[in-house]
């Protein structure tokens, strides 16, 4: 049976090696903005939260979130997600994150990701809001 849990900061080192590979794959879609070491620092030093999905045998997936305080609203951002057998833990993870967000004064959840995530979330009541555009600047 799949369970999901927040990982308190003092326990991150005990499970990091098991989730590092999942999260490394997620950083490959950041176009050089993040490496997996940056995610480790984010959860250990900068207030991001690590969540895991697991069964009696192994950790199946990991999500990193952070709270974003906008001038008018506060959202829990699902910043990074990775794992295997996603369909087995997606719903319990989203329910846990919804509950945590409500209990901590957030007005909603948000995620930034590639277009494929639209299919994942469309049955969950999520809506697509916008695209992001990038203009790299020459460094020379």
Labelled PLM ranges:
Residues 1-34:
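Short amphipathic alpha-helix that is part of the acyltransferase structural core
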Residues 21-34, 53, 70-81, 98-102, ...:
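Long, low-complexity, intrinsically disordered polar/charged segments
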Residues 28-48:
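Active-site rim helix/loop that mediates acceptor-substrate recognition in acyltransferases
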Residues 71-124:
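Acyl-donor binding region in acyl/amide transferases
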Residues 112, 127-139:
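Conserved catalytic-core motifs of GNAT/GCN5-like acyltransferases
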Residues 118, 139-140:
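Flexible, glycine-rich phosphate/dinucleotide-binding loops
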């Amino acid at each position: 049976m799949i369970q999901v849990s927040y990982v308190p900061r003092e326990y991150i080192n005990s499970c990091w090696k098991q989730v590092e590979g999942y999260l490394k794959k997620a950083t490959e879609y950041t176009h050089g903005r993040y490496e997996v070491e940056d995610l480790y620092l984010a959860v250990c030093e900068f207030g991001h939260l690590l969540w895991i999905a697991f069964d009696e045998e192994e950790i199946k997936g990991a999500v990193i979130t952070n709270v974003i305080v906008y001038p008018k609203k506060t959202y829990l951002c699902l910043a990074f997600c990775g794992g295997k057998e996603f369909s087995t833990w997606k719903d319990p993870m989203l329910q846990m994150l919804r509950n945590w967000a409500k209990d901590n004064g957030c007005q909603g959840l948000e995620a930034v990701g590639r277009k494929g995530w639209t299919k994942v979330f469309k049955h969950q009541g999520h809506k697509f809001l916008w695209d992001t555009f990038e203009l790299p600047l020459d460094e020379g």
